A protein has these predicted regions:
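Non-catalytic helical/linker scaffolds that mediate oligomerization, partner binding
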Residues: 1-471
Length: 471
């Protein structure tokens, strides 16, 4: 039973009802909606289709909206495409002009104020490199260091530069408000660089009474440098290796990945490893050996989830990609000694009672060789706390709330279930244990460890452990 969660990006290759159904059957835990593309109406249609399917199939697939984020893009070129020659002069301007091989417009009008002579500007994920020679109020005069073809609306990156553009654009604000109304479980905040970025999003969520959890996407040196303060306020982080690999030296990406995963794991926060994990499966039915190793290594490092982007959004083999990723994850998990990792985890002196009870729950489950840890939770808080310790046995997290159950599907080792509301706590506890039995996780005579907060409904009040024998 796989513990690591799989996120699939929904796009032309995967948005049909038939393919969504197959992806859910294959093990998709979270469906990602990329707001860099598509209209609100298109996203709404796909979202409602997925929600209908997850209810019909009884699988609590979570939904994640991924913001466009603060970005800089080139405007249009004559003929749609030009060739930049190495060593040639090239000017970026804030004026609205049709682009040529000598001059092109940029979307961010304050870029000349932010860059300086000698700096580097990258275009199209770093394929084109420019060196800044001089700057005026409206123009940035550059030399082409690495040339190549450039076409309409390609992205622009400025490594090691603090940009003064606002974190939340008008488009992002409209998208977030739309996401609040529709009811996504998660939001991935693109290009997060500080804790304040996350707090700005929290204010919007609060104003719309949204319980969306926030995943901070780390895509720059600033984001890496501020990872501690970001983890303090975010619900999780994503190692977004695509833009991160453009903003920082390529050889540093694996180092940062391991560093971020470790910090998130210690704090009990969700951590997603993303970008090009099975990239060759965009066109091939099997991944490279290096890609298989990359996926496995992220799991050995302690990632909560692994993400497919183009592989499921527009690739030729979306279903095969999910099945392959699931097999790789299961093989890696089978090799990991989670019992030993739990035993060697540093003690948390001065922990709050919920943390202490969650830790003790995992200890009891390990000592009695329990088939499962079962928790009844109204908010998902208890499940998140237990998931932090990555116990050997599965965590069956039951809630009367469908959104909470779906939200818990991004937690490591958690099997979320929706149970009916009962008249009292004892009946809820029995319903949770029976849910584990009906799912085939535990059978008659097996021991399970039950934990919850009594009375139910008070977030952060986990205070009870009980051993149940399944009857």
């Amino acid at each position: 039973m796989r513990k690591t969660k799989i996120i699939c990006t929904i796009g032309p290759a995967s948005e049909s009802e038939e393919m969504l159904r197959q992806l859910i059957d294959a093990g998709m835990n979270v469906a990602r909606f990329n707001f860099s593309h598509g209209t609100h109406e298109e996203h709404k249609e796909k979202f409602k289709r997925l929600v209908r399917l997850r209810r019909e199939m009884g699988v609590p697939v979570a939904t994640l909206m991924d913001t466009k984020g603060p970005e800089i893009r080139l405007r249009d070129f004559e003929g749609g495409r030009v060739m930049l020659e190495k060593g040639s002069d090239f000017t970026l301007t804030t004026e609205e002009v049709m682009g040529t091989a000598e001059r092109a417009s940029i979307s961010y009008k304050d870029l000349p104020k932010d860059v300086s002579e000698g700096g580097m500007i990258l275009i199209d994920d770093g394929l084109i490199e420019l060196r800044v020679n001089s700057v005026t109020e409206t123009e940035i005069h550059c030399t082409v260091v690495n040339g190549g073809p450039v076409s309409n609306h390609k992205g622009v990156n400025v490594p090691d530069t603090d940009l003064s553009m606002p974190f939340i654009s008008e488009q992002d604000r409209a998208d977030i408000e739309f996401g609040c109304k529709l009811g996504y479980e998660y939001i991935a905040a693109s290009f997060t660089t500080t804790a304040d970025d996350i707090l700005q999003i929290r204010e919007i969520l609060k104003a719309h009474n949204s319980r969306m959890k926030i995943i901070a996407k780390i895509e720059s040196t600033q984001g890496v440098n501020n990872i501690g303060e970001i983890l303090d306020v975010a619900d999780g982080v994503m190692v977004a290796r695509g833009d991160l690999g453009v903003e920082v030296p390529l050889e540093e990406v694996p180092v940062y990945q391991k560093h971020i995963i470790h910090l998130a794991e210690v704090r009990g926060k969700i951590v997603v490893t993303a970008t090009q994990m099975l990239d060759s499966m965009m066109h091939n039915p099997r991944p490279t050996r290096a890609e298989a190793t990359d996926v496995a290594n992220a799991i050995y490092d302690g990632t909560t989830a692994i993400m497919l982007s183009g592989e499921t959004a527009s690739g030729a083999y979306p279903l095969e990609a999910v099945k392959t990723m699931s097999r790789i994850a299961e093989a890696a998990e089978h090799d990991i000694n989670y019992r030993s990792r739990f035993k060697n985890r540093p003690s948390e002196f001065g922990a709050d009672s919920t943390t202490a009870i969650s830790h003790s729950t995992c200890m009891v489950a390990q000592d009695i060789n329990a088939k499962a840890i079962v928790t009844v939770t109204m908010s998902g808080f208890t499940a998140r706390r237990i998931s932090k310790y990555k116990p050997t046995c599965p965590i069956v997290a039951c809630s009367v709330s469908e959104p909470v159950a779906c939200q818990m599907n991004l937690l490591f080792g958690v099997i979320p279930m929706t149970i009916p509301q009962e008249d009292n706590e004892e009946m809820l506890f029995e319903a949770a244990v029976m849910a584990a039995k009906q799912a085939g996780i535990a059978v008659k005579g097996d021991k399970v460890v039950l934990t919850a907060g009594v009375p139910l409904g008070e977030t952060g009040n986990t205070n009870m452990i009980r051993v149940f024998e399944v009857f």
